[in-house]
Structure formats: C-alpha cells, structure tokens
C-alpha cells in the first residue's frame, strides 16, 4: 500500500506517477498484481480523502480504506516526510510491535531522512 499525503491535491501527482509506473511495468505489475493500492490524502484542500496518514492509522480510517491494518508478520514500512511526521509514524510503528531497521539490521520499518525540512 502506497500512501501519499500532501497539503493540496495537485501535489499528489508524484505518488500517482509512482503507482501507475509500477502497475504498468511488465515485471513489477506481475509481482504486485491487484495487491498494490494507492491512498492519497490532503491536509488543507478539501478532497474525498482528507487527513494525515498518522490520524488515519490511529482512528481506523486506514484499515477501513484498505481492508488491512499494519501487521509485523506481513508488512514493511518506509517513512519519508517532515521531522514531526517521522516521529509520529515511528511511534505508531513501535506501538504495533514493529522494530526499526537499518542497512545492517533489517526491521519492520525504516525512516528516510533525506527530505527532512
């Protein structure tokens, strides 16, 4: 499941481009089949899917939208975004029993800090 949250709808194009390129790639599309989902939300512009993904994970909207909850048995999470969002997502993952990973010790989630502002 690829989630992408931005302030405004036109900022969501990057996530849509990644999603559609995976779905149209001959090798990757066979691997992901119908399992790949895209959940795009906005935080400032009114849209059919509004709110921060951290809120969605905590209030059940993520599970309602995807039919799944995060599982340490089947899921791996890569988190990228603002410093505050990274902290919030990390705490949610830890509460679900997930362990942070690194290059030398794979875990259930990793944090990408290259884009922290």
Spans of features found by a protein language model:
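Reductase modules of NAD(P)H-dependent flavoproteins
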Residues: 3, 10-117
């Amino acid at each position: 499941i690829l989630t992408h949250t931005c302030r405004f709808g036109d900022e969501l194009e990057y996530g849509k481009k990644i999603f559609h390129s995976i779905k149209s790639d001959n090798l990757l599309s066979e691997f992901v089949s119908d399992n790949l989902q895209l959940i795009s939300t906005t935080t400032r512009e009114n849209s059919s899917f509004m709110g921060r993904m951290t809120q969605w994970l905590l209030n059940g909207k993520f599970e309602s939208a995807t039919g799944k909850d995060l599982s340490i048995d089947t899921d791996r999470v890569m988190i990228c975004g603002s410093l505050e969002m990274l902290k919030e997502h990390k705490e949610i993952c830890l509460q679900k029993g997930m362990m942070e990973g690194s290059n030398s010790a794979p875990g259930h989630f990793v944090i990408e800090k290259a884009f922290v502002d």
